Amino acid sequence: MSNDIFPNKFKAALAAKEIQIGCWSALASPISTEVLGLAGFDWLVLDGEHAPNDITTFIPQLMALKGSRSAPVVRVPTNEPVIIKRLLDIGFYNFLIPFVENVEEAVQAVASTRYPPEGIRGVSVSHRANMFGTVPDYFSQSNKNITILVQIESQHGVDNVDAIAATDGVDGIFVGPSDLAAAFGHLGNANHPEVQRAIQHIFERAKAHGKPSGILAPVEADARRYLEWGATFVAVGSDLGVFRSATQKLADSFKK
């Protein structure tokens, strides 16, 4: 059976340093995820860390994005091999790994997504990712088509950014601005000069190692500044944020 799984176009675009504009899907709804996919974003994060998602909610969202130009990226709840294996088996190819602080954690994230001998991913011969055994080249192509994006959002992560960025199999470095701000003692203020310097430093070190960098920036001025600083994959909003803002504006227009 033919398939359109390989090659991974999002992974190729990142490697080519093409600008990739994304959005966050936080409502855990296949309807809202489908709407985001229709909007034309290059990539969408389906959030498993802070949104109420699990395996059973992710599958209908993946189905909703079938045929969309938007590449689904799953943010896993934690850097744990069994969780990552299950998300691979349901059909994710692009992974955002939160709270990576050192090279050992980066290596573990990569290994969790690779079949032996390159990694430790468990083997099932029939699952959703290989169209239930109907993709003949799945096992030969899977390892080279997985995207690993690691999130730096702590002081230790910043201190170890060079080693993390140099890790084989890491495709990009993503900044978690809110947790990074908290780690630097500026909870709720990612625009504090100290945090901004750290963000710019991460972008610069990623570039020095030939890796693209990204960030979540729902404020347009922030997003444009980060693009100017060299970030190439930027999430510029979320379904939850857009929905809350638009509904509040609508209510206010009639109640004030």
From Swiss-Prot:
Cofactors, names only: Mg(2+)
Protein name: 5-keto-4-deoxy-D-glucarate aldolase
Family label: Belongs to the HpcH/HpaI aldolase family. KDGluc aldolase subfamily.
GO CC aspect terms: cytoplasm
Active site per the UniProt annotation: 50 (proton acceptor)
Keyword Protein biosynthesis annotated: no
Gene: garL
GO molecular function terms noted in the UniProt entry: 2-dehydro-3-deoxyglucarate aldolase activity; magnesium ion binding
Quaternary structure annotation from Swiss-Prot or TrEMBL: Homohexamer; trimer of dimers.
Binding residue positions for substrate: 151, 178-179
Site (Increases basicity of active site His): 89
Pathway the protein contributes to: Carbohydrate acid metabolism; galactarate degradation; D-glycerate from galactarate: step 2/3
Classification via Pfam families: HpcH_HpaI (PF03328)
